[in-house]
Every structure is written in structure tokens, then in C-alpha cells.
């Protein structure tokens, strides 16, 4: 039985060591501007006492960009500036992510949809095309399902609403290990505290297909953000409530807005999971981009734009409003 005591001692030592590592991490300082988009000033909007970072630039019909789990608005750096040449583009850091506040919250699907809805109201955004990637795409679909006045149409890029929320574990061995341990009591939080830049980089690489897809410095930025007090707790809470994204799919049948489902052929979702969304969302169009993975706006930005802009133009021919006409003309 001595080996049992030895194992327990090692585990306890590992837990204690993780707390020391976390305490010694240097707390990062928020950037005052985006190196990749200096023309877009960094601003904040407050929702229920929680400050959310966002940027806005461009003139024209409104687009809102929503990122995914454990990332931030910088995920759109390859499409946001291009879109801003034709549209008014907003990109938002979700609560507990990026440089937004990290509140004590449930971090489930309802929470994110509620916060984003209120943020759009505070920003007086109406009739916008909501473009979300992964969980951001799921948020966009749920906003439309709940008939939010802010939603004109939705582009859901690789929406994350399958496999009980465990889809990321399909991306790589490292992601399977790290996120597989997250829900294990004590061990999961210990792994979170021992996070490192190489592991963050490997997990991000599991979401792209092309070798040059990840911009220089992005992994480091996302890793540094993870050193903010409370960040690991927030991500742990989100992972514990992953299943709520798939459960919320029951609301898709209520969507009455135009929807474009855009997938990479190497997304973590399976063919039948994509087909289920196309079936369950009335009138949804499904497109698949070749040789591209989950973080599609980074992996295949030109192809995303090539699918997106013509689709916006089709909104008017399908009986859309004057807003759709403006979208088509601006494209």
C-alpha cells in the first residue's frame, strides 16, 4: 500500500505546485490599440456591471463578429479590416475572454446569449448581420432564434453545437488530453493552472489546416490573457457547461432570419452534424470550404469573404429589406 501513499503525495505536491506557478505568473497589461488594426479604437461597453472590450470601424450596414471559447476578437484579424472597407464592423470580446471583465457567472449558453443581446442593445445595434465562429456562431443562431431585434441575418461559421460540447477533443491529442481532464475534480483545475504557451499553441494549431494560418504573436497573446486573475476559473466554468450549446439546438427551428452555415471540410464537426443544422434551421444554406479547419476566418479568410459577400447580396433577391439592398450594393 506504500505506492498508494506515494501517488497521493505526488498528486498533492502537483496541486500545491500549480498554485505556486499561478501566483508567480506576471499579470498582463491590456493593449491600448490593436497592432493588426490600429484604425479601430479599443472601447468598452458595460452590461450588468461587466465591461466588455470591443472595436468598431468602417461605414455602412452593420456586421457584428463573435469569437469562440478561450479566444478573443483578434481571431478575426484577417477578415475584420477587409470587411470594414464596406461595412460598419463591430468585434467583441465575450465576458471572461480576451480583455473583457471576468465575472463570477455560470458561463453557459443562456448567459452568453443574454450578455451579447444586452451589449447590442447598449450599442444601439439593430438589423445587423451577426457573424460568429464556433461558439460565436452558436450565439448568433440563438440570438436569431429568440427573435432579437438586433439580428438581420446570421452567418454561423463552424457552429459549436455537437458532441455534448466535447468537439474540441477531436482536434488533437493535446486538446483531447487537456479538455478531457478539465472536468475531473481537482485534477482539471490543476491542469488549468499549469497551462503553458506551447500547449496553447498546439491546441490552436488543432483548429487550422494550413501551416501559415496562425498569425505571429496570436498564441502568445491568448496565452498571456490566460494569466489574468479569474480567467482559468471562467474557462473551467464554460467547459463544465459545454453541453448547453448542443441542448440549445432545440431552439433552431424557431429561426426566421436568413442563415448561412459555413464549414471547413476539416472542422471538428462531422458531416451528419452539419447536415442536422441545415435541416433544423428553416431555409438555411450550407457551404463547405475545402482544405480548411475550425478557425475558418484565420485558416481561409479569402474563401470566407468570397462566400460571405455574395450571400449578403442574395438577401435582397430573396425578399429582404432595404438593409439587405444596402448590403448587396456595398459589396
Per-segment meaning from a language model:
Residues 1-61, 86, 125-126, 313-331:
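Alpha/beta-hydrolase fold catalytic core
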Residues 24-26, 166-170, 189-253:
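Conserved alpha/beta-hydrolase catalytic His-Asp/Glu region
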Residues 50, 55-99:
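Conserved HGGG/HGGXW glycine-rich cap/lid loop of the alpha/beta-hydrolase fold
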Residues 55, 91-131, 306:
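Active-site loop/oxyanion-hole signature of alpha/beta-hydrolase fold enzymes
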Residues 71-81, 99-102, 165, 247, ...:
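Short N-terminal helix/helix-N-cap motif within the alpha/beta-hydrolase-1
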Residues 126-169:
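Conserved hydrolase catalytic core segment
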Residues 258-292:
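Conserved loop-alpha-helix segment in the C-terminal half of the alpha/beta-hydrolase fold
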Residues 282-331:
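Catalytic active-site module of serine/aspartate enzymes centered on a nucleophile-bearing elbow/loop
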Amino acid at each position: 500500500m506504500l505506492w498508494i501513499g506515494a501517488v497521493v503525495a505526488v498528486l498533492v505536491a502537483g496541486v500545491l505546485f500549480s498554485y505556486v506557478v499561478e501566483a508567480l505568473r506576471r499579470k498582463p497589461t491590456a493593449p491600448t490599440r490593436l497592432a493588426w488594426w490600429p484604425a479601430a479604437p479599443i472601447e468598452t461597453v458595460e452590461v450588468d456591471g461587466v465591461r466588455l472590450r470591443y472595436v468598431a470601424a468602417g461605414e455602412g450596414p452593420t456586421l457584428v463578429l463573435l469569437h469562440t471559447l478561450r479566444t478573443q476578437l483578434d481571431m478575426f484579424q484577417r477578415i475584420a479590416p477587409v470587411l470594414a472597407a464596406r461595412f460598419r464592423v463591430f468585434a467583441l470580446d465575450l465576458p471572461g475572454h480576451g480583455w473583457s471583465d471576468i465575472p463570477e457567472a455560470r458561463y453557459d449558453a443562456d448567459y452568453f446569449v443574454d450578455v451579447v443581446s444586452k451589449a447590442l442593445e447598449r450599442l444601439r445595434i439593430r438589423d445587423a448581420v451577426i457573424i460568429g465562429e464556433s461558439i460565436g456562431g452558436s450565439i448568433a443562431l440563438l440570438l436569431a432564434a429568440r427573435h432579437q431585434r438586433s439580428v438581420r441575418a446570421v452567418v454561423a461559421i463552424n457552429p459549436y453545437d455537437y458532441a455534448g460540447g466535447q468537439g474540441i477533443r477531436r482536434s488533437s491529442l493535446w486538446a483531447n488530453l487537456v479538455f478531457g481532464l478539465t472536468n475531473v475534480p481537482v485534477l482539471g483545475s490543476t491542469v488549468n493552472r499549469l497551462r503553458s504557451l506551447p500547449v496553447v499553441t498546439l491546441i490552436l494549431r488543432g483548429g487550422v489546416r494550413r501551416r501559415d494560418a496562425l498569425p505571429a504573436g496570436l498564441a502568445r497573446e491568448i496565452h498571456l490573457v490566460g494569466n489574468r486573475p479569474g480567467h482559468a476559473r471562467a474557462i473551467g466554468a464554460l467547459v463544465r457547461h459545454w453541453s448547453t450549446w448542443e441542448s440549445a439546438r432545440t431552439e433552431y427551428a424557431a429561426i426566421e432570419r436568413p442563415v448561412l452555415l459555413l464549414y471547413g471540410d476539416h472542422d471538428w464537426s462531422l458531416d451528419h452534424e452539419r447536415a442536422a443544422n441545415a435541416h433544423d434551421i428553416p431555409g438555411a444554406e450550407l457551404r463547405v470550404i475545402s482544405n480548411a479547419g475550425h478557425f475558418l476566418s484565420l485558416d481561409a479568410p479569402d474563401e470566407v469573404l468570397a462566400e460571405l459577400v455574395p450571400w449578403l447580396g442574395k438577401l435582397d433577391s430573396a425578399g429582404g429589406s432595404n438593409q439587405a439592398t444596402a448590403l448587396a450594393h456595398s459589396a
